[in-house]
Amino acid sequence: MGWGNNYFRTPLYPRMGIQQTVFEKEAFHRFLTDYTGALNGCAGADKTWNRGALASEVRAFYSEQATEYGYTSLRDWQQVKKPLVNPLYSAVGVLGFMGPFFCESQLNTDLPEIEYPFTLAHEMAHLAGVTSEAEANYWAYVFCRQSKDAAVRYSGYLGLFVYAASNASALLQNDELVAWIETLSPVVLEDHRSIQEFWQGKRVKAIDNVQRWMMDRLLKSNHVTEGAHDYFGVIAMIMTMDAQIGTEI
């Protein structure tokens, strides 16, 4: 139950003494250009990581970096666990889950390897005390992009793809959106398509709808005002942090 107190902590921006960057189209264009170049640059990278070593790297990252911003370091004994009812996780499209009562992070065992690094880092961010889904995405992205392993970096960039595409759809004119899509590597588009089809094939719509409603209510009742849409705030957070404290943190 103690983990739930994290919902009452001061948000990241005030804690760091910075203001959120104004989300302007020109600034988003710059972000999108840099992001797309990095995404394409490591698309198709061969996997060289293993899960045990990757988990150790994630723990070390949070212990060295996130503690500077008020979060807790992670111990060697803190491991992600397997859900007891994994088919239910897949039926509702949940890739991972933070259990607040026993402070345990769980990962869906059906996760494709390409999604594993980003999702692992996201769930371990929660274990370090991060409650905002946007911020957990932010920390997961920062971990992945600083990795020396191109496949880990790709997992991070691909993990952001749905959020970048959503913002692009909202901010760009149709011809600009089409032009951006044409700059994407065919490997990226195929990986995104295969991931979407993989999870769609496991979803049970009725259960999924109930889970989404419950998640939205849970987050809103715990001071996450955006509810389930909080995940999408990661792009604004990346633009703010990169502009005000630099890409290396």
Spans of features found by a protein language model:
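Auxiliary, metal-adjacent structural segments of Zn-dependent hydrolase domains
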Residues: G41-T109, E113
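Active-site/pore-lining binding-face segments in mid-to-C-terminal subdomains
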Residues: Y138-E190
